[in-house]
UniProtKB/Swiss-Prot annotation:
The lineage of its organism: Bacteria, Pseudomonadati, Campylobacterota, Epsilonproteobacteria, Campylobacterales. Coiled coil: none annotated. Keywords: Cobalt, Cytoplasm, Magnesium, Metal-binding, NAD, NADP, Oxidoreductase, Pyridoxine biosynthesis, Zinc. Its cofactor is Zn(2+); Mg(2+); Co(2+). GO terms for molecular function: 4-hydroxythreonine-4-phosphate dehydrogenase activity; cobalt ion binding; magnesium ion binding; NAD binding; zinc ion binding. The active site is located at the dimer interface. Catalyzes the NAD(P)-dependent oxidation of 4-(phosphooxy)-L-threonine (HTP) into 2-amino-3-oxo-4-(phosphooxy)butyric acid which spontaneously decarboxylates to form 3-amino-2-oxopropyl phosphate (AHAP). The keyword NADP applies. Its main location: cytoplasm. This is 4-hydroxythreonine-4-phosphate dehydrogenase. The gene is pdxA. A divalent metal cation binds at H177, H216, H301.
Length: 364
């Protein structure tokens, strides 16, 4: 079976409960490695009145060298150690504060995630599944990242792309956790062309639509529309480039050379992967809109996530594209209001994420 490295997220949230409750079923489809120290797992188990049986847990430690070892088997748990350069000393002796924002749990969740990421990168597992973190807890811990995807960009020096959804609807995010006021400035021909090229090469979707940035996609310039003009130009260029089968070197050169862009467009005939004009976002998510195109790109976070979660919240997942590792996540937060209360918790997104990761790993 495929091996999944699973980071625990913020231990003050619902992640640990999802992990423990789902372990038996998850183990039927993969071999999970949970990145948590035994004493913290015991504390959480006591609070939840739940036990984790027949599982593999990985204690991670800051060290200059990478080293993975089996330590012992105890109380039906297989305990491993994974040493790597984390940049922080690991503190696993703090108290769990159910439902609270806490710097210690924030830092621990980050280190669990970083260790699990490199565990996959070092080929000890086939994919990474991350449980939800709290961005404020990361900030309070002194971390500079706005979330998992932002950190992965830094770890692997790649332009990671966030995609969310399910088989009925997937949406790629051109921008993620930045203020709305900054999105327009980010929409440039170069930035968008690179994104569209990478998004297609990672997904190979047959038809992709871009959601307009302005109301009614600019309405022919009546409501703004400058961003839509840039989008149309980038769409035409990327469609022509993908059709041409030319290489990355040519792409980089053509980004700066309008004559090469014109040459590509003159030689391009027929339909492209991307629909030629931005879609009006307020109708793109209707039944008719999704029947026409259910693989979309949004210029900003909430333009995609508000309708996606209204339609498919329980089964949507988060996928990081354009990385040297496979990374998936649940598409929900820490749910501090439900943590350690034996509340009803839906685990569908967790299982969908695991299945998606397994299927992706079978293709690589």
């Amino acid at each position: 079976m495929k091996k999944l490295a699973i980071s625990i997220g913020d231990i003050n949230g619902i992640g640990l409960e999802i992990l423990v409750r789902s372990h038996e079923e998850l183990s039927k489809i993969c071999t999970p490695f949970y990145f948590i120290h035994e004493n913290l797992l015991n504390k959480a188990s006591k609070l939840l009145n739940l036990k984790l049986f027949n599982a593999k847990i990985v204690a991670f430690k800051d060290d200059k060298d990478y080293e993975f070892n089996f330590i012992k088997k105890e109380n039906s748990l297989e305990i491993y150690s994974f040493c790597l350069p984390l940049g922080f000393k690991v503190d696993e002796n703090f108290e769990i504060k159910a439902g609270e924002i806490d710097a210690k749990s924030g830092l621990y969740g980050f280190l669990s995630f970083k260790a699990a990421s490199y565990f996959v990168y070092e080929k000890h597992a086939h994919a990474l599944l991350t449980l939800p973190i709290h961005k404020k807890a990361w900030e309070d811990a002194g971390l500079k990242y706005k979330g998992h995807t932002d950190a992965l960009r830094d770890f692997f020096k790649k332009n990671a792309i966030m995609m969310l959804g399910c088989k009925e609807l997937f949406v790629g995010l051109f921008s993620e956790h930045i203020p709305l006021a900054k999105v327009s400035k980010k929409i440039t021909f170069k930035n968008l062309s690179i994104f569209l090229k990478d998004f297609y090469k990672e997904t190979h979707f047959k038809k992709i639509g871009l959601l307009g940035f302005n109301p009614h996609a600019g309405d022919y310039g009546v409501i703004g529309g400058e961003e839509e003009k840039i989008m149309e130009k980038a769409i035409a260029f990327v469609n022509a480039f993908l059709h041409s089968k030319k290489d990355e070197k040519f792409f980089k050169k053509a980004l700066k050379d309008e004559n090469l862009q014109k040459e590509l467009l003159l030689n391009f005939k027929g339909k492209g992967v991307y629909l030629p004009y931005p879609l009006v976002a307020d109708t793109a998510f209707t039944k008719a809109g999704l029947k026409n195109c259910n693989r979309l790109v949004a210029m900003y976070h909430d333009l995609a996530l508000a309708p996606l979660k209204a339609l498919y919240f329980d089964k949507s997942i988060n996928v990081s594209l354009n990385l040297p590792i496979i990374r998936v996540s649940v598409d929900h937060g820490t749910a501090f209001d439900k943590a350690y209360k034996n509340a009803k918790i839906n685990t569908k997104s967790y299982f969908e994420a695991a299945k998606f990761a397994i299927n992706l790993s079978l293709k690589t």
